[in-house]
Amino acid sequence: MNLIHKVSTICQCVLVILAKYCMQIIALSLMSGVQWLAWGIYKINKNRVGIIILFLYIMIVTCYVLTNLTPPGSPSETSFDPNSTRQYMTLQNGKSRFCEKCQEYKCDRSHHCSQCNKCILRMDHHCMWFKNCVGFRNHKFFFLECFYLNLYSICVLYSTFVAITKTFTAEGANISAIYLVFWGFLFAFAVGMSIVMTAFTFYHTSLLIHNLSTLESMSSSWSRYTHSTQPFNVGWYENWCQIMGKSPFLWLLPFPNSIGEGVEYPLNANALPYLPQTEEKNDKLYKSSVPASIAGAEGWSSDEEQYAMKNRRWNPHMGQYEWIEDFLV
């Protein structure tokens, strides 16, 4: 009975692990399977591309593991002090945003992740392939994963194409049909993966050089800004260095050298006129931007209209008034 109980317990543990880390197991299995096929091609057609593919595979697995195991960071894990830290994303009264679920204050660019059940520093998105949030502390590893996976797919595509064409053009070639089936599968997989990862890498490169997260790029609250007035856009080089680090020699290496601790970010000087103000400054801004005939409280036809006008701000980019709350996402 003891043996049966132990075996049953072990099986249950294995099933729990498989269920919990299903996507990670699938991802690593695909990487290893593709590399096994690619190495088989290298053994038959030896060239330098095969060595490059092996190096890229090592970098892919390394970055994948680091993205999974590195916590993205949370405001509670930093020296963030809502009373002394300069912030852009504040409430109308100038106070820091407060997360009701975490029961803690949120710093700039932090958002609550329902999957991780905590607030994430500079949250980009929650990725099912990593079972982790992509945030300030692991964003570099995530980007390098995309970058190296893109190069890997292109190199595998080239290597497979060369192997197939050599097989069909060489005289007296004697290659087993099973090899051609595997190579055909590998070629099709590499085509699809290279297309997807090229688009994905270009997209995330664009986000980095414009200092945007995926959440911010998809938010209607940020669509009102141009690149020149985006609050955190301080130039493509400085934007890039915030995540990838100051040293160009470490940009493509999986070392955690992002600048700062993800709490405070330099602001774009061009965006200063459009940044949220305190209640007092908002009131001054409002009075200077609405016609004098309706600026006084006695001019309001109803409490609702008074609230509506006092809680709107002129957006010069959109050419219309917008709710102040929309600026505070």
Curated annotation (Swiss-Prot):
EC number, as in UniProt: 2.3.1.225
Location of this chain's protein in the cell: Vacuole membrane; Golgi apparatus membrane
Q: Name one Pfam family in it.
A: DHHC
- InterPro entries on file: Palmitoyltrfase_DHHC, PFA4/ZDH16/20/ERF2-like
Q: Which residues cross the membrane?
A: 14-34, 49-69, 141-161, 177-197, 243-263
**Which Gene Ontology terms cover its molecular function?**
protein-cysteine S-palmitoyltransferase activity
PROSITE patterns given in the database record: DHHC (PS50216)
The cellular component terms of Gene Ontology attached to this UniProt record, alphabetical and capped at eight, are: endoplasmic reticulum; fungal-type vacuole; fungal-type vacuole membrane; Golgi apparatus; Golgi membrane
The enzyme's main class, written as a single word, is: transferase
An example Gene Ontology biological process: vacuole fusion, non-autophagic
Q: How is it modified after translation?
A: Autopalmitoylated.
Q: So what does this thing catalyse?
A: L-cysteinyl-[protein] + hexadecanoyl-CoA = S-hexadecanoyl-L-cysteinyl-[protein] + CoA
Asked if the Swiss-Prot or TrEMBL record annotates the protein with the keyword Cell wall biogenesis/degradation, the reply is no
Residue limits of the DHHC domain?
97-147
Membrane-protein topology: Multi-pass membrane protein
Q: Superkingdom, according to UniProt?
A: Eukaryota
Keyword Membrane on entry = yes
Kindly state which keywords UniProt assigns to this record, in alphabetical order. Answer: Acyltransferase, Golgi apparatus, Lipoprotein, Membrane, Palmitate, Transferase, Transmembrane, Transmembrane helix, Vacuole
Family indicated by similarity: Belongs to the DHHC palmitoyltransferase family. PFA3 subfamily.
Domain-level remarks: The DHHC domain is required for palmitoyltransferase activity.
UniProt-listed PANTHER family: PALMITOYLTRANSFERASE ZDHHC16
Q: What this chain does, per the record?
A: Palmitoyltransferase specific for VAC8. Palmitoylates VAC8 at one or more of its N-terminal cysteine residues, which is required for its proper membrane localization.
Q: What is this protein called?
A: Palmitoyltransferase pfa3
Organism per entry: Schizosaccharomyces pombe (strain 972 / ATCC 24843)
Tell me the organism's taxonomic lineage: Eukaryota, Fungi, Dikarya, Ascomycota, Taphrinomycotina
